[in-house]
Amino acid sequence: MRQAAPPAARMRMDAKVISKAKLPSRHVTVGPARAPHRSYLYAMGLSAAEIAQPLVGVASCWNEAAPCNISLMRQAQVVKKGVAAANGTPREFCTITVTDGIAMGHQGMKSSLVSREVIADSVELTMRGHCYDALVGLAGCDKSLPGMMMAMVRLNVPSIFIYGGSILPGSYRGRQITVQDVFEAVGQHSVGTIGDAELLEIEQAACPSAGSCGAQFTANTMATVAEAIGLALPYSCGAPAPYEMRDRFNFASGEKIMELIAKNIRPRDIITLKALENAATVVSATGGSTNAALHLPAIAHEAGIKFDLFDVARIFEKTPYIADLKPGGKYVAKDMFEAGGIPLLMKTLLDHGYLHGDCLTVTGRTLAENMEHVAWNEHQDVVRPANRPITQTGGVVGLKGNLAPEGAIVKVAGMTELKFSGPARCFDSEEECFEAVTQRNYREGEVLVIRYEGPRGGPGMREMLSTTAALYGQGMGGKVALITDGRFSGATRGFCIGHVGPEAAVGGPIGLIRDGDVISIDAVNGTIEVALSDSELAARAKTWKARTTDYQSGAIWKYAQTVGSARDGAVTHPGGAKETHCYADI
C-alpha cells in the first residue's frame, strides 16, 4: 500500500502551494479520472505531495557525440535539485542534437539545421504529451541553443535557458588554440606548410575538456544572446563547462523557475521586439556568428514577431564592435567570463544607449535592474568600453543587391579590407569547391560561388567551414572571396558571404551567374552586385531549370517540403502569428 507523504514533504508543500487550477499538469494529476495517470507517476517513486506540485520539464541535449553536450546530464541533476528545493517536481528528458564539428565537411552537415527544428518540435511534443507546467532547457552545441529557445517561446510556459558552457582552450607550443586552428591546419597540411606529426599534435591539443567550441562561434554567440534576450540568468552562460561553479547557476535556475510559475512570467513576456534588438546588438558587438541572423528571426517567428535578416542587419549597422574575441580577435569565452562575463559587455552597451533597459528577464527584473550592480573592470582588455570600440560599426554586416534581393550576411570582425570585386568561379556543391581548393584549382582575386546549398536546395543549408578554413590555411583567406546560399560556421573568417537569397534552388540570381561574371561586394555600404543587367538576368532565368536533390524521402526530404527563406529564419511552420491557442493555456 502507498504511504502518505512524509511530514517533511508535507511541510515543503505547505510552505508555498502553487494552485494547479490553470496549469497544464492538472490534466494528468487532478481528479478521480486521472487516477491511472497518477498511478504511472507513483510507479516512478513520486509521492502524493510531489504529484500535487507543478511538474517542471528539465530538458537537455545530452549525448556522447561531442564534448559540447557531454556534461549536460550531470548539470541537469543539479537543476532538478533546485526545482525540488523550491517545491516543484522535476521531470527530466533528453532530445537530439547534431554537432556541427562532427557533421562538418560531408553529407552529415545537411542534418544540422534540420536538427534545430527537430529539437524544437520534440521538446514541444514531450511537454504537450505529458502536460508539464514549465521548462528548464539545457543546450550545448550550435543548433541546440536556438532550438531549445524556440521551443520555450512556442510553448510559452515559464522557461529558463541554461547553456552547458564552453570548452577550455587548448595549448599548442605556448599559444591558445581552438578547433578552428585544427580546421585551418588541414589547409596548411594540404600545401605542405605542416606535416603529419604537427597536424596530429594540433588535433590532440585543441579540445582539452567538455564544453562547446571556445571562441565566439555559433554556440557562444547564441549563449550571449540567451542572456541578452532575457531567457538565461545573468552570468550563467559565460562559465566554462568544466567549472564546478556552474552548479550555482544550475541550482538557481531550478529554484527560479518555480518563482516564474508563481508569477506567471512567460517567454512571450520576455521575447519582445526590443529584446530581439538587444540580442542582435550583442551579436554584432562581439563579432559573433552570422548564424544568429538565421536564428533570431526563427525565435521571433515563434512569438509572432516579424524580425527578419534586414531587421537584424539594421541593428548590426549601428552597433560598435567591442569584444576582442576569436575568430576575428584574440580571446576565447573563458577569458570574457573571467574579465566580467556577458553582463560586463551588456553594461557598457546599456550605459551608452545601445540596449533597451526596460526589457523583462527571467530574474523577474528588467535588464537595466539586472545591470545595476555590474561594475566596469578596468584591468582587462577583452571587452572595450562602448565609446572606445575596436571599430565603430558592428562585427557582422547585412548585404543586399541584385545578387541577393532577399539579403546576405558577412562577418567583418578582424577584417581590414571591406570591399572585394572579382570574377566568379561557380560550384554547385560544397564538395566541388572543397576539391578545387585542396587541388589549388582557383586563382587569387576570384569570387568562389557555392550554390544549391540553401535551406531547400541542399537541403539543409550546410556550413562551409572546411572550405573556408582550407583557404585560410593556404594563406588565401584574404585573397579570394566566397559566397553561398548556404551558411558559414561561426569559426569562419575571411571575406565569406552566406545566406544569399533567394537561394539557387528556387531560381534566385545566385543560380544564374556563370564563371567569369564580375561580382562586387561592399561591406561598407552593404551591397552585393553582379555586373549583369536586369534583362540579362531575366533572359537567364527563362532557361533555368529546377533541380532534384538526392533526398527524396526521410527527415531531410520532409524538411525541404516545408522550409522557408533564410531571410525569415528558414522556419518550417506558420509560427505564433497564426496560432489560435497557446499550449500554456490548455
Curated annotation (Swiss-Prot):
It is an enzyme of class 4 (lyase). One of its GO terms (molecular function) is 2 iron, 2 sulfur cluster binding. It catalyses: (2R)-2,3-dihydroxy-3-methylbutanoate = 3-methyl-2-oxobutanoate + H2O; (2R,3R)-2,3-dihydroxy-3-methylpentanoate = (S)-3-methyl-2-oxopentanoate + H2O. One of its GO terms (biological process) is L-valine biosynthetic process. Binds 1 [2Fe-2S] cluster per subunit. This cluster acts as a Lewis acid cofactor. Keywords: 2Fe-2S, Amino-acid biosynthesis, Branched-chain amino acid biosynthesis, Iron, Iron-sulfur, Lyase, Magnesium, Metal-binding. Mg(2+) binds at residues 100, 142-143, 463. Homodimer. PANTHER family: DIHYDROXY-ACID DEHYDRATASE DAD (PTHR21000), DIHYDROXY-ACID DEHYDRATASE, MITOCHONDRIAL (PTHR21000:SF5). This is Dihydroxy-acid dehydratase 2. It comes from Mesorhizobium japonicum (strain LMG 29417 / CECT 9101 / MAFF 303099). The gene is ilvD2.
